[in-house]
A protein has these predicted regions:
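Short alpha-helical "patches" and their helix-cap loops
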Residues: 82-83, 234-245, 341-345, 558-560
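Transmembrane and membrane-interface helices of multi-pass
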Residues: 2-234
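Solvent-exposed soluble domains appended to multi-pass membrane proteins
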Residues: 251-637
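Alpha-helix initiation and N-capping motif
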Residues: 21, 124, 217-220, 239-243, ...
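Glycine-centered secondary-structure boundary/capping sites
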Residues: 59, 81, 110, 129, ...
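The feature marks either
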Residues: 205-212, 216-267, 274, 306, ...
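Short amphipathic alpha-helical patches
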Residues: 73-81, 110, 114-124, 128-132, ...
Length: 637
């Protein structure tokens, strides 16, 4: 068999394996998320799978076929052929991991991967540890399969590779490369007509409903499109119209510069002298459903809420830690078309939480029980101008724990207490738990096992019980200190627990399914216990603590202090899947901005409600302000 025939035969077999793998991944997505796709008809499902091949071929053409082109470069070398096939199989296994990761991601968030691949580096140590510990057998199997594949590939090349005469070999190689090039162009465009634009996500949306398009797409295609269009988004409103609709300066605030529509300072404070310590306790994956249904799993927190200002209409700003952290620390929601704080958004000017305490000579202390590299939390804390930062590597472990990829809240809370207790000044403290982060299949401390480890919920509840005990120990220590009486604690979760294929009460509204939360403002010597109906999100935390300590520094936000009586009654939640939820005392509305043509049609026909239009305006105004450096003035902060 000639060299070219060997390459052609092996290439066809390779591409067949790749196409089958893409199909199996789509089938896995459909079966794993069957409840989500169950509303599709049989015809819609069939057409989705059929159209899915177009988007699979496009992904293969962009990321895999270029290596096949290199294979047919007229190099008459057995070693060269082995190197290219090694790269081809490596690309296949990497693609397989991305596709499989996308299925898991979709089962949690009901959206495909987009720019999330950029955050892989921030979770690399966690992913690696999880792969080598909790899923070592899967990791081992993948590596074993990879090397077995290489073994048989090399063996076949050694057996069938023969050298060819140069003139014919070169000519045939060039013809094959030209044919592959034409196929690549056709696949990238999704048709044989080479005019017009390449295949895009909108093409999938035009083929049917939102769920149809989601079944058509794959994680590689959606990620490539998301990264390509990271700073390019469709804006539905005129820029100035969006800014005018989005302005929300209340009478207690003062606008500073009309060119900076969200830049203001607080001129009238809600109450008190401002001479308070502030402590934020950011709870990994805690949520209201577990608090209400399993109070025995968090007895210390239940006791705290009885003596707190308890905001029962508090909502998370996102489904992921990075979104919630950005909202909490910088008062910026999820903004489509802009990168995450750790991938470029940090280059924009914005309000930095700890800076508002420097003018008052506060100590600023941030403790995270997770690794500093997780979501680059160390960099985020430093960017927020916290003077002291401590993470898992800085926390002495005093209990005997099993091997766990995250950190231990008991020792973390103790370190946090020691650091704020040693402060000679007032302080801002930020504590970020992580012991309730998955995987949950191991008991951290036997004495804090409340339930048998037989179900996923029980495993998580045992973690809650441990983390709650750690927080209870912290407050027992804090109550004995003189600074406790003038300290305001703000306690709230980052997001819901991300169980794959989690089922919710069908009677719940989507915003309540995915974002409902709680906020306890605990200061028994300052506030009388009360349940408060105010609607608020994590975006409100920064304006609120600025209000509490009477900071006169300018800040930028599209929201207001939670205590501001003139603030809007409704809140806006911008989900990572481009859905917007508007929630208030007498309002609940949604709008899906991923369906661009539908939104344009609603605008053209003037069918958007006032709140839907305002929701679009707010996000677009924030986008324009951040992108054009009109969000915050650097010189002041």
């Amino acid at each position: 068999m000639s060299n070219l025939k060997t390459k052609l035969k092996m290439s066809c077999l390779y591409l067949f394996v790749v196409i089958v793998a893409f199909f199996i991944i789509r089938l896995s997505l459909f079966l794993l998320c069957f409840d989500y796709f169950s509303t599709l008809s049989n015809n819609e499902i069939f057409l989705s799978f059929l159209n899915g091949f177009r988007f699979d071929f496009s992904s293969i053409a962009i990321f895999i076929l270029p290596l096949v082109v290199f294979l047919f470069i007229p190099v008459n070398s057995k070693a060269y052929t082995k190197i290219i096939f090694t790269l081809m199989w490596l690309m296949f296994f990497v693609s397989l991991l991305i596709l499989a990761g996308d299925v898991v991601f979709f089962s949690i968030f009901n959206k495909h991967l987009e720019t999330e691949l950029l955050s892989v580096q921030t979770h690399f140590s966690f992913i690696l540890q999880t792969a080598l510990q909790s899923y070592w057998y899967v990791t081992f199997s993948i590596f074993l399969l990879f090397f077995i594949t290489l073994y048989f590939t090399y063996r076949y090349i050694n057996k069938n590779f023969v050298f060819q005469s140069q003139p014919k070999f070169i000519l045939k190689s060039i013809l094959i490369i030209l044919c592959i090039g034409l196929i690549m162009l056709a696949c990238i465009r999704g048709k044989w007509d080479f005019r017009g634009k390449p295949l895009g996500i909108m093409d999938a949306q035009l083929l049917g409903s939102q769920k149809t398009s989601e079944l058509i797409l794959n994680g590689i295609f959606s990620s490539a499109e998301g990264l390509r269009r990271m700073e390019d988004r469709t804006c539905f409103l005129d820029k100035q119209e969006a800014i005018n609709l989005a302005r929300n300066i209340t009478p207690s605030e003062q606008e500073i510069d009309s060119d900076y529509p969200f830049y203001r300072y607080k001129k009238d404070f809600s109450f008190g002298t401002g001479d308070y310590n502030i402590v934020i306790i950011f709870l990994e994956s805690w949520e209201r459903e577990y608090y209400e249904q399993y109070p025995e799993a968090m007895p210390n927190f239940v006791e705290i809420t009885k003596n707190s200002l308890y905001f029962k209409n508090f909502y998370n700003s996102g489904s992921r830690s990075l979104t919630s952290t950005t909202s909490t620390m910088f008062s910026i929601p999820y903004v489509w078309g802009l990168p995450f704080i750790t991938n470029g958004l940090g280059a924009k000017n914005m309000s930095r939480m700890a800076s508002y305490f420097k003018e008052k000579d506060y100590s600023t202390i941030f403790v995270a029980t997770d690794n500093a590299s997780a979501d680059k939390i160390g960099e985020v804390a430093n960017y927020s101008q916290f003077e002291q930062f401590y993470a898992k590597a800085n926390i002495p472990v005093t209990h005997k724990y099993p091997t766990y990829t995250k950190g231990f809240d008991w020792e973390g809370f103790e370190l946090f207490f020691n650091k704020i207790n040693s402060s000679k000044n007032n302080f801002l403290g930020f504590f970020y738990t992580s012991s309730t982060h998955g995987p949950w299949d191991m008991i951290l401390l036997k004495e804090y096992q409340l339930y048998p480890q037989t179900t996923r919920d029980n495993q998580f509840l045992n973690r809650l019980y441990y983390s709650d005990a750690a927080m209870g120990n912290f407050f027992n220590l804090a109550k004995q200190q003189p600074w406790f009486d003038k300290t305001i604690f703000l306690i709230f979760p980052d997001h819901h627990v991300p169980f794959p294929n989690r089922t919710y009460d069908s009677n719940l509204r989507d915003a309540d399914k995915y974002f409902t939360s709680f906020l306890a403002i605990y200061a028994p010597k300052i506030f009388k216990p009360q349940q408060i109906d105010t609607y608020a999100t994590q975006e409100d935390i920064l304006p609120t603590i600025i209000d509490l300590v009477h900071s006169s520094q300018p800040y930028s936000s599209d929201t207001n202090s939670i205590f501001d009586k003139e603030r809007s009654k409704e809140i806006y939640i911008y989900a990572e899947n481009k859905k917007v939820y508007i929630v208030g005392p007498d309002i609940y509305e949604e709008i899906d901005l991923s369906n661009i043509n539908k939104v344009k049609e609603l605008i053209a026909e003037d069918k958007l409600s006032y709140y839907q239009k305002k929701a679009i305006a707010r996000n677009e105004a924030i986008y324009h302000s951040l992108k054009n450096h009109k969000w915050h003035k650097k010189s002041n902060n």
